Swiss-Prot record:
The gene is rpsK. Belongs to the universal ribosomal protein uS11 family. GO terms for cellular component: ribonucleoprotein complex; ribosome. GO terms for biological process: translation. Keywords: Ribonucleoprotein, Ribosomal protein, RNA-binding, rRNA-binding. The keyword Membrane does not apply. This is Small ribosomal subunit protein uS11. GO terms for molecular function: rRNA binding; structural constituent of ribosome. It comes from the Bacteria. Located on the platform of the 30S subunit, it bridges several disparate RNA helices of the 16S rRNA. Forms part of the Shine-Dalgarno cleft in the 70S ribosome. InterPro entries: Ribosomal_uS11, Ribosomal_uS11_bac-type, Ribosomal_uS11_CS, Ribosomal_uS11_sf.
Length: 130
């Protein structure tokens, strides 16, 4: 009978991080929520695609809500209580993701819009004619 081999690999430790920063990138096609500590190390992340949505449904507000809830659940397990929210992009899931973080039990101290605005940089794509 074969002997069982004990694994000696490093197990991810649960650290206690009370404060953090939530980055919400909301595009027309997807919403990505990543939660980091104040120094920038990512604690948890989720996206509409990782939450099981495919295709056009990834850009919906409900998909953004589901992604934010999943990321918040993992951050709460690490002991996070207070967050600052940085929102980037024009997508439909911006407000819904923020509301989902609040309902999950995280206390929001700041909401900042960090959407990049070009000072007449690259040429825009031509208009769609449908």
């Amino acid at each position: 009978m074969a002997a069982t081999v004990k694994k000696t690999g490093s197990k991810k430790s649960k650290r206690n991080v009370p404060n953090g920063v939530v980055h919400i990138q909301s595009t027309f096609n997807n919403t990505i929520v990543s939660i980091s500590d104040t120094s920038g190390h990512v604690i948890s992340w989720s996206s509409a695609g990782a939450s099981g949505f495919k295709g056009a449904r990834k850009g919906t507000p409900f998909a953004a809500q589901t992604a934010a809830e999943a990321a918040a659940r993992r951050a709460l397990d690490q002991g996070m209580r207070q967050i600052e929210v940085l929102v980037r992009g024009p997508g439909a899931g911006r407000e819904t993701a923020i509301r989902a973080l609040q309902v999950a039990g995280l206390e929001i101290t700041l909401i900042r819009d960090v959407t990049p605005l070009p000072h007449n940089g690259c040429r825009r794509p031509k208009r769609r004619r449908v």
